[in-house]
UniProtKB/Swiss-Prot annotation:
Residues 106-127 are annotated as: Disordered. One of its GO terms (molecular function) is structural constituent of ribosome. Part of the 50S ribosomal subunit. Coiled coil: none annotated. GO terms for cellular component: cytosolic large ribosomal subunit. GO terms for biological process: translation. Gene3D superfamilies: Ribosomal protein L22/L17. It comes from the Bacteria. This is Large ribosomal subunit protein uL22. Disulfide bonds: none annotated. This protein binds specifically to 23S rRNA; its binding is stimulated by other ribosomal proteins, e.g. L4, L17, and L20. It is important during the early stages of 50S assembly. It makes multiple contacts with different domains of the 23S rRNA in the assembled 50S subunit and ribosome. Belongs to the universal ribosomal protein uL22 family.
Amino acid sequence: MRAVAKYVRISPRKARLVADQIRGKSYPEAASILRFTNKRAARILGDVLKSAAANAENNHDADPELLFVEEVRVDEGPTIKRYRPRALGRATMIRKRTSHITLRLGAPEGVPVGGAVDTPGDEEEEE
């Protein structure tokens, strides 16, 4: 039950500040923290959290309200390089950093996660 957002145009260092706030929290608590955090990364992480909850509900038949943020990782993506003109004909490089955000939801110990997922061909034939 995970969700990944790749090539997000936010500095990994700034995104990690918000990611550290929700690590280990329950899904409702993490969603509430992100809703009231006044940072651009909070909105991005909120979208990834919602996506992970939707994946848990649709793919694993799990109730997102019972899950918690098991892992949230912000890795560095490729850096977009731009140049800014400076004095005396010089130029300096501007680095626009990108992030890869991975968020995994898990169930606390002893709590079953959803039902079995039905796949075609699993039914036993009756004779």
